[in-house]
A protein has these predicted regions:
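Conserved ABC ATPase "signature" region
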Residues: 100, 104, 111-129
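Catalytic Walker B motif of ABC-type/P-loop ATPase nucleotide-binding domains
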Residues: 158-161, 167
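Conserved ABC ATPase signature
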Residues: 133-140
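Hydrophobic anchor residue at the start of the ABC signature
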Residues: 147
Length: 168
């Protein structure tokens, strides 16, 4: 039997009288690629934010990696990577500081962080750029860095919000 890693049942998010997501129900099994398609304002980002534990649903149920989105959000965050459409990077940090910051959030040990930082910097071809401010990077580099820090801790599930916007 295939492992269900995301399961929703009538997941709804309201902002006052406005319904951003209306009773969405689906399942995603391990290894499956799943995507939301829709016009701007259709609720794709809202749905992802609920699934990542960043926004509380108005009603419905969901579990991510076996954890309930209402009362196990911290456990969910340890098992997912999330790259928002704004890249979730701090413009006033250097490349190296960004990697260390996100590694710390994901609970990597100092040893893991050192190894992963060096490996990531090498893979991205940024060895001579580690002191460069994120705000000074071209959009494509920001996107590569944002994706890289989202998967730094080898999450079970990765959420990508508009992952191809601005790719060179």
């Amino acid at each position: 039997m295939k492992e269900i890693v995301i399961k929703t049942d009538k997941l709804t998010k309201r902002f006052g009288d406005f319904i951003a997501t209306n009773e969405i129900t689906f399942e995603v099994v391990a290894g499956e690629i799943f995507g939301f398609l829709g016009a701007n304002g259709a609720g794709k980002t809202t749905a992802m934010r609920m699934l990542c534990g960043l926004s509380k649903p108005s009603s419905g149920q969901a579990s991510i990696a076996g954890f309930d989105i209402y009362n196990q959000t911290e456990q969910i965050k340890k098992h997912i990577g999330y790259m928002s459409q704004k890249f979730s990077l701090y413009e006033d940090l250097t490349i190296k500081e960004s990697i260390q910051f996100f590694g710390g959030i994901y609970g990597l040990t100092d040893k893991q962080l050192k190894e992963k930082s060096e490996s990531l910097i090498e893979q991205l071809g940024l060895k001579d750029q580690t002191k460069k401010m994120v705000g000074d990077l071209p959009l494509g580099w920001k996107q590569k860095l944002a994706f890289s820090v989202a998967i730094l801790h080898h999450p079970k599930i990765v959420f990508l919000d508009e992952p191809t916007g601005g790719v060179d």
